[in-house]
Structures are given as C-alpha cells and as structure tokens.
C-alpha cells in the first residue's frame, strides 16, 4: 500500500488551528501526519486517517527530554481522537462537527493527572468559510468538556478562532480558549484564558511548516513568557 501526496495544502479543510479543532476533516482515505516540537525538548507525534467523507480518527504520543542527557519523560499513554461532521456547510450555515480528543499539550503533570494545556475532551464546533481577495477566511466557534479534572476543575468551556489565507501559501491562525476549566485554586491557569497565534507555510503539495506562539496572555504563574512551538504536517492518501 503506497502513500501518495495528492492534494494541494490550500485545498484541504483546516482540521485544527493552533490547538483548537475545527469542523474540517480529512478526505476519505486521507492521511495526516503531525510532529510538534515544544519546550523541554518535547516532541508530540500524531497520525490521523479519514475513514469516510464525514469522519476521521487519530492517535498521538509524545514526551519531553527526548534530547540531551536528562531522563526520558514519556507521556503516560497513547491518546486518541475522533470526529464526525453532522452538518455540512451551506451558503448561509456553518459546518457542524462533534468529536473527542484526549491529547493535551505541553508536559504531563503526574500529580494533577493533566497536560499543561488540558485536552479538549468532548467537543462540538461550528466552522464557516469565506472567500476574500487575499484568500479564504474561516471562523470557528466551539464548546468542550475536558476529562482532565484532577485539579478539581471540571467546568464546560469554549473557544473561538480564525484562519486567514494570505495568498496561496501562507495562513495566519489565531484562537482564544476561555479557560473556564482551568481557573480553580489547584489549576495551572489563572483566569485570563489562553490566546494562541501561528503562521503556517505550505512548502509543497504534501508538507506544511507552522510556527506558533501559545499562551500569549501568560495565563498562569508557570508561564512567564509565551510558548514557542514548531509543527511539521504531512498530507497524503492511501
């Protein structure tokens, strides 16, 4: 079975902003590979597969201190995700998808049983795309409930985001997570919410490179500066 890059990046639906899922999907038999490089010599790898025209699944795994002479610190488990689009986008209505993702971002806190940035857990998201002179623009609104509640904060929360194309090869990303599930006494957040932004370059029909600034509002005392991350993405078909 061969994996063949067959789509231009700009023709693919954005499945994710920086962290926030959208209502976008991989095509049937589509393959997505992701590598994220984050602080603490951390690497997070993910594989997603389009099972049919309205659904996809994925797995991910990673860890920190992968380089250097420190003890390797792997995440405690392989994480899973799935997404189904329940409503197709129309001229006046957004696409609507529901899904589940157990993968959070950053290092895993063994005491609180959570990632630095909690996973979205179960979520519903609406996405609407528009064509503008410079390129497409997508608006996204979601609500979610994470199951990483070892800190005692299990509130529902939500997020908003936008992706804007600048020509054929560059996309600017921005998202704001309200962080309502990360503002209790034992939480890592401090109530400001999480604002992330990024820029994504299409390198070829199969590859994209992305640079992200995360937690720009510096939500939480453990974040004196925004996080800088690098992401490499591959798209193909099997």
Residue spans for each PLM region:
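N-terminal signal peptide c-region/cleavage motif recognized by signal peptidases
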Residues: 3-5
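Transmembrane beta-barrel domains of Gram-negative outer membranes and organellar outer membranes
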Residues: 7-137, 143-148, 163-171, 175-238
């Amino acid at each position: 079975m061969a994996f063949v890059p067959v789509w231009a990046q700009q023709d693919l639906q954005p499945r994710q902003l920086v962290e926030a899922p959208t209502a976008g999907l991989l095509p049937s038999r589509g393959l997505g590979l992701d590598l994220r490089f984050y602080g603490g010599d951390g690497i997070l790898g993910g594989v997603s597969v389009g099972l049919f025209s309205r659904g996809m699944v994925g797995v991910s795994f990673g860890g920190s201190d992968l380089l250097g002479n420190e003890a390797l610190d792997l995440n405690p488990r392989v994480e899973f995700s799935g997404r189904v689009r329940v409503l197709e986008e129309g001229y006046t209505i957004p696409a609507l998808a529901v899904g589940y993702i157990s993968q959070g971002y950053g290092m895993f806190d063994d005491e609180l049983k959570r990632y630095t940035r909690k996973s979205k857990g179960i979520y519903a998201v609406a996405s609407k795309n528009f064509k503008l002179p410079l390129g497409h623009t997508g608006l996204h609104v979601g609500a979610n409930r994470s199951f990483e509640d070892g800190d005692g904060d299990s509130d529902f929360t939500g997020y908003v985001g936008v992706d804007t194309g600048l020509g054929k090869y560059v996309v600017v990303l921005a998202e704001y997570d309200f962080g309502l599930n990360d503002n209790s006494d034992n939480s890592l957040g401090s109530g400001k919410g999480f604002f992330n932004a990024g820029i994504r370059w299409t390198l070829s029909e199969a590859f994209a490179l992305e640079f992200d600034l995360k937690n720009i509002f510096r939500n939480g005392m453990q974040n004196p500066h925004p996080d800088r991350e690098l992401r490499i993405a591959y798209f193909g078909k099997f």
